Amino acid sequence: IRCFITPDITSKDCPNGHVCYTKTWCDGFCSIRGERVDLDGCAATCPTVTGVDIQCCSTDNCNPFPTRKRP
C-alpha cells in the first residue's frame, strides 16, 4: 500500500497489512486557518487520540490532503 505523508505530501510505500491515515484537529489558529491536517502515512492499526479526528483507509494513496472551506 502507498500512503501520502506530510510535510512534502509525497506518496511512500508502507508494509503489507498497514492502513493509511490522516489526522485533523484544532490548534490555536483554528478560527483563522481551519483545522490542522497531518498526513501521517501508515500504521499497523488505525490509531486513536483524544481530541483528534483520525481517518483510516486501506487502498493506495487514499489519504490525500482534504479539501475544506476556510473559516
From Swiss-Prot:
Does the entry annotate any disulfide bonds, and if so which pairs?
A: 3-20, 14-42, 26-30, 46-56, 57-62
Which Gene Ontology molecular function entries are recorded, alphabetically?
Answer: acetylcholine receptor inhibitor activity; ion channel regulator activity; toxin activity
Keywords from the named record: Acetylcholine receptor inhibiting toxin, Disulfide bond, Ion channel impairing toxin, Neurotoxin, Postsynaptic neurotoxin, Secreted, Toxin
Provide a GO CC annotation, any one: extracellular region
Keyword Secreted in record: yes
Q: Which domain of life is it from?
A: Eukaryota
Tissues and organs where the protein is expressed, per its UniProt entry = Expressed by the venom gland.
Instruction: Read off the Gene3D superfamilies from this record.
Output: CD59
One Pfam match, given by its short name, reads Toxin_cobra-type
Write out the annotated subcellular location: Secreted
Its annotated function is as follows: Nicotinic acetylcholine receptor antagonist. Binds to muscle nicotinic acetylcholine receptor (nAChR) and inhibits acetylcholine from binding to the receptor, thereby impairing neuromuscular transmission. Produces peripheral paralysis by blocking neuromuscular transmission at the postsynaptic site. Induces concentration-dependent inhibition of indirect twitches and abolishes contractile responses of tissues to exogenous acetylcholine and carbachol, in the chick biventer cervicis nerve-muscle preparation at 100-300 nM (in vitro).
Family named by the database record: Belongs to the three-finger toxin family. Long-chain subfamily. Type II alpha-neurotoxin sub-subfamily.
Query: Beyond the main fields, what else does the record say?
Result: Constitutes approximately 3% of the whole venom protein content.
Its protein name is: Alpha-elapitoxin-Nn3a
